[in-house]
Amino acid sequence: MTQYIRKLLPLIVLLCVSVAGSPGAWATPTPAADKIKVVTTIPDLAYMVGEIGRDLVEVKSIAKGSEDMHSIPMKPSYLLLLNRADMLFEVGFDMEHAWLPDLLYNCRNEKIQPGAPGFVNCSARIKPVEVPDQPDRAEGDVHPEGNPHYNTDPANGRLTAKTICDGLCGAYPDHAERFEANLEEFLERFDRKLADWEILARPLEGVRVITYHRSWSYFAAHFGLEVCGEIEPKPGIAPTPRHMAKLLRKIRDEKIELVIKEDYYSNKYPRFLKEKSGIKVVTLPNMSGGRPETKGYFNFVEHNITSILRALGKRVLTPEEIEKELNNE
């Protein structure tokens, strides 16, 4: 598959270059002609780039919020975006290793290659978890640099915003003052939301869960949930009957309350566990924009907290009640 892509994409590059002056993915009205064209790998990064860059940037995400970041389908339109981009922001920790290197190899855009000012790895400030001692593909789809799903933890989202600002300032120092002012205003709003979420999520402290994939380790650590196992016996590997039987025993013995799965995973195995044990199941997006109500990073985080609370039958505080709690602290 990789060899096929490498043969095909250079032909598409020629097409991209030949139509560079015609309407396309980056075609915009004349007033926007001088905007910094930014591509991100996920919607969360696009949202933050938009908040920090504002009217100075035009930003597009390759992945949709409903997609599995480990297996993004290859499309010629992605190559066109990268060919015309001024900057590229990636998640990092090898999240995009299965598809982004081929796109970068073939896009013929030196501005966004690793090491160039236009390439930003957004994991720079993140402390990774689950870093394997000796990475081995026999252990499944492991990430040598650690778990890449750090975006689910809003504290990491805050750090990511700072890294995005660093990248924009480094590539476009003439606009650094505006980027930094926008970041400061964004972080003020972020901190207010983070305080709200800490109160909203208090009932999640100590709740024991099983996840489908290791997508929720950072979220769980931040809000006090205990991840007791995964439906996948190894990352990216489908469960065997023996593994499912083991999970059933664990659910009963350890009083595990909830299964968390993503939209793009099959309902087959969570449904089996629910039917056999009565455990509750919640389906969540692990990127913003996966559903209409999760457009924007703030909505994404809040949706996941409230969805888990409701799945557990716990009460969701109103904004007025949260404000009262904040005032009492």
Stretches with model-predicted labels:
Residues 26-329:
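Extracytoplasmic metal-acquisition and chelation regions
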Residues 9-22:
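Bacterial N-terminal signal peptides
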Residues 6-7, 14, 73, 216:
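Intrinsic structural disorder/low-complexity segments
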Residues 1-5:
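N-terminal secretory signal peptides that target proteins for export/translocation
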